[in-house]
Structure formats: C-alpha cells, structure tokens
C-alpha cells in the first residue's frame, strides 16, 4: 500500500477517496503491507494538508488493523533502492517509492494499491477498479 493510497483512504476530500474505500473492500481478505517509509511519508502529507487529527487517524488505523501491517525497510533494501535510483533518469522517482520497489522485489510482491503511476512504470501491477 503506497502513500497515495493511504492519503486517498484517510482523506474524505481526496479525489480518489471513494475508489480507495472500494478497493480496500475488494481486497479485504488479501494480506496488505506497507512500509515504515510509506507510513512516515503518508503521516507528513496528511498532517500538512489535512491536519493533525486525520494524521493520527492514519497511525491508529495502521496500529489497529487486522489486515494491514507495517514492514521495515532494511538497510539492504535501502541500498538496492539507492542503486536503482542512480540508474534511473526516465522519471522523477521518489526515494520512498524506490524503497517500496526494493521491498516489493525482495518480498516477491507484484501488486500494489496506489494512485501513483510510477509503480506501473517500475513494472508493478497497480490494482484498480
């Protein structure tokens, strides 16, 4: 689960909010994983754009979820991400996205809940309605 998905899910004013809720409902039995970097980026984005209370709701949702878990990006995955970023000039990939790509590749995760086109460009299957 990428930052853009978490933002859409938690922020009722986000243009993808309804789609995020429906996607989450459709994939309710799937194992849902996000990373500590994504959690931090989502916190920062939601806090700055929507305020403290919605950002705390994100943390509570992650903490209380039976379906979603937070995995930590290892130093090895971070190193893979940095090497990958050095070789990529075709798009403005973010550091957090690159760590997600590395985590997904090493964990053999091929599908992602996101509204960020960079995941498809990096070769992952974006789950949509």
Could you describe each region identified by the protein language model?
Residues 1-34, 47-60:
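Short, well-structured N-terminal submotif of metal-dependent ribonuclease cores
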Residues 5-6, 41-42, 80:
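A general alpha-helix detector
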Residues 36-37, 97, 116-117:
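Short secondary-structure boundary segments
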Residues 44-47, 105:
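Short glycine/serine- and small hydrophobic-enriched flexible loop segments
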Residues 50-53, 89, 128-129:
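Short, hinge-like loop/turn segments at secondary-structure boundaries
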Residues 69-111:
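Active-site neighborhoods of divalent-metal-dependent phosphate/nucleic-acid chemistry enzymes
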Residues 101, 106-129:
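Acidic, PIN/NYN-like endoribonuclease modules and their adjacent C-terminal/linker elements
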């Amino acid at each position: 689960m990428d930052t853009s998905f978490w933002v859409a899910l938690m922020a009722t004013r986000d243009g993808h909010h309804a789609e995020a809720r429906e996607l989450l409902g459709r994939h309710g039995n799937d194992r849902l994983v996000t990373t500590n970097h994504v959690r931090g980026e989502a916190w920062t984005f939601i806090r700055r754009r929507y305020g403290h209370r919605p950002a705390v709701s994100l943390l509570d949702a992650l903490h209380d979820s039976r379906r979603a878990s937070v995995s930590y990006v290892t130093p090895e995955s971070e190193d893979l991400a940095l090497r990958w970023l050095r070789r990529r000039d075709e798009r403005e990939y973010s550091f957090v996205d690159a760590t997600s790509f590395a985590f997904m590749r090493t964990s053999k995760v091929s599908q992602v809940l996101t509204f960020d086109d960079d995941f498809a460009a990096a070769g992952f299957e974006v789950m949509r309605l």
